[in-house]
Amino acid sequence: MDTKTHSLPITHTQLHSNSRPQSRTCSQCTCTHHRQTFSQSCRQSQRGSRSRSSSQSPATHQNPTGAHSSSGLQSQSPNASPPPKRHKKTMNSHHSPTRPTILHSSCPKNRKNLEGKLNKKKMAKRIQQVYKTKKRS
């Protein structure tokens, strides 16, 4: 029984690492609607992770997330499965069709950042070329 409880936090960290790229894509975009809806879901996941990490001694609190991935205890899995399902439904219904347009066309700050990076690269190349030509002559 001890080995099962030790393996559960590992699956919990794997589940969290899968959800992190979504928050990274959200932090890049500065659109207000996208940030508001995603920040709410981020807060919910942070609340859950805080409560799980603070109460590591009772194994019953960690079992729902472990049971979701390893299907060890099915009686407690309904307690943990509704929040991820709600999160996924909101992401699919609101953001997946609009996410490409948000990242590319409707976020002017994102576009400016990309243009700035390209301009910096161009300027670096120009400076290097000028430096090389001055050295030769």
UniProtKB/Swiss-Prot annotation:
What is one term from the GO cellular component aspect held by the record?
nucleolus
Compositionally biased intervals (Low complexity): 39-57
Q: Which residues cross the membrane?
A: none
- Superkingdom of the source species: Eukaryota
Which InterPro entries does the entry mention?
A: TP2 (IPR000678)
Give GO terms: molecular function aspect only. DNA binding; zinc ion binding
Q: What is its main location?
A: nucleus
Regions of biased composition (Polar residues) lie at 1-31, 58-79, 93-108
Location of region: Disordered: 1-137
Biological process terms from the Gene Ontology for this record are: acrosome reaction; penetration of zona pellucida; positive regulation of protein processing; sperm DNA condensation; spermatogenesis
Q: What stretch of residues is annotated with the motif Nuclear localization signal?
A: 116-124
Pfam name, any one:
TP2
Q: In which tissues is it expressed?
A: Testis.
Keyword terms, alphabetized: Chromosome, Developmental protein, Differentiation, DNA-binding, Metal-binding, Nucleosome core, Nucleus, Spermatogenesis, Zinc
Residues annotated to bind Zn(2+)? H12, H16, C29, C31
Q: What subcellular locations does the record give?
A: Nucleus; Nucleus, Nucleolus; Chromosome
Q: What does this protein do?
A: Plays a key role in the replacement of histones to protamine in the elongating spermatids of mammals. In condensing spermatids, loaded onto the nucleosomes, where it promotes the recruitment and processing of protamines, which are responsible for histone eviction.
Q: Which family does it belong to?
A: Belongs to the nuclear transition protein 2 family.
What is the protein's name according to its record?
Answer: Nuclear transition protein 2
Native source species:
Macaca mulatta
Q: Which gene encodes it?
A: TNP2
